[in-house]
Design a protein with these regions (language model features):
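Extracytoplasmic thiol/disulfide redox context detector
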Residues: 2-87
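C-terminal cap of thioredoxin/glutaredoxin-like
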Residues: 20, 131-191
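Short, flexible active-site loop motifs that bind/organize anionic cofactors or intermediates
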Residues: 45, 116, 130, 139
Length: 191
């Protein structure tokens, strides 16, 4: 009798359990695949914006995923530049990347915007966040205005058309497959 009830329960629940991801629903295949940094690894590219509340809420789940990601998976962050006002924070990201201070500045910058509700609209305010985290002012100034940061920000601006994005956060796998929280059914299901 117990086996019979178990079988009935499984039959009732089975349609609710998804077997996998469906193209066109959970993700889309990019019409023009993009090259990855290292073709020998699976690349997961996150397109984000510091001012995006959805990106902020994805961060804890993303951090947990990163702690347990397989060794053959490379994770790359790219700040999206979907408008002129997004450029300042994209340059902030590339500044922290080039200075090697991502781990100490990334989360505090998100928290200034989303927890403390600060509007970051000037280079001076961005610099203050970096300095608060132990970055020297002259290092920030030199890097923020560098050719490398300007070039990387320009490439990030092109991502809008290359990946066909209209919002963030977005994950692109191996330069071929794009998903978002909206497509996948939530932040957790993106990962």
């Amino acid at each position: 009798m117990k086996t019979w009830f178990t079988l009935i329960a499984l039959l009732l629940v089975a349609p609710l359990v998804r077997a996998g991801f469906d193209e066109g629903t959970d993700y889309k295949r990019l019409a023009n695949p993009q090259p990855t940094v290292n073709p020998d690894q699976i690349e997961v590219l996150e397109l984000f914006w510091y001012g995006c509340p959805h990106c902020y809420h994805l961060e804890p789940q993303l951090s947990a995923w990163l702690e347990n990601k397989p060794d053959d998976v490379a994770f790359v962050r790219m700040p999206a530049v979907l408008g002129a006002d997004w450029e300042l924070l994209a340059r902030a990201y590339y500044t922290m990347e080039l200075l090697g201070v991502e781990e100490q500045v990334h989360r505090p910058l998100l928290e200034h915007i989303h927890k403390q509700r600060k509007r970051i609209r000037s280079v001076d305010y961005v610099k203050a966040v970096f300095v608060e985290q132990g970055v020297q002012e002259q290092d920030f100034d030199r890097t923020f205005e560098s050719f490398a940061v300007i070039t990387k920000t320009s490439r990030a601006r092109q991502a809008r058309s290359l990946y066909g994005i209209t919002g963030v956060p977005v994950l692109v796998v191996n330069g071929k497959y794009l998903t978002s929280a909206q497509m996948a059914g939530g932040n957790k299901d993106m990962l």
